[in-house]
């Protein structure tokens, strides 16, 4: 097996490295000191195709591969951990679930905006009393029998990109059933929640 990068991947890495050095690194210290979210950098990365690297062009992506995506996150994280995590949470935890599991209508609605950087994505699992233990979470979802809409009730914490995200993948309990030993087990589902949905709000940023 050849572990050397292809010429194409070397060129891609060079492009990401130059972007990281010129556009991201100069802001890194300022972002940490001021606890500021680099929305201007997100917009630039969107124009460069970095917010949807390995998604096909048919859904608005750059048409690259996973290795190119990994190299992008690596180069960004070398100079600014904040920016690397912004891209990885947006891509792996929000855009990817929609691409892999969404309906054709959901893909058409969300992926072009996510891949272009017009919209930012986030993922909500962690809770105040449960951490990232899905079985311990207290966010529940119930379906309205008349409208068919799902109503979510609960709170999440430590959600990367939450302050600026337009769309969230939120994990909620939809049923409780016995396991093989008769113990109650929570069944969880992933929901697409938009920032503008009724009843949704984002709390103050944590002092980190």
Q: Residue ranges of each PLM-predicted region?
A:
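A short core secondary-structure module
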Residues: 149-203
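Cytochrome P450 C-terminal beta-domain/meander region
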Residues: 133-153
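Conserved G/P- and acidic residue-centered "switch" motifs that form tight phosphate/ATP-binding loops
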Residues: 49, 103, 154
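Flexible, small-/acidic-enriched active-site or ligand-binding loops
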Residues: 136-138, 198-208
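N-terminal glycine-rich flavin-associated loop
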Residues: 85-105, 131-134, 143
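A short, Trp-centered hydrophobic/proline-enriched beta-strand micro-motif
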Residues: 117-125
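Short, solvent-exposed loop/turn elements at beta->coil junctions and helix N-caps
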Residues: 58, 125-130, 157-158, 205-208
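Amphipathic, small/basic residue-rich leader segments at the start of a protein or domain
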Residues: 1-87, 106-109, 113-116, 143
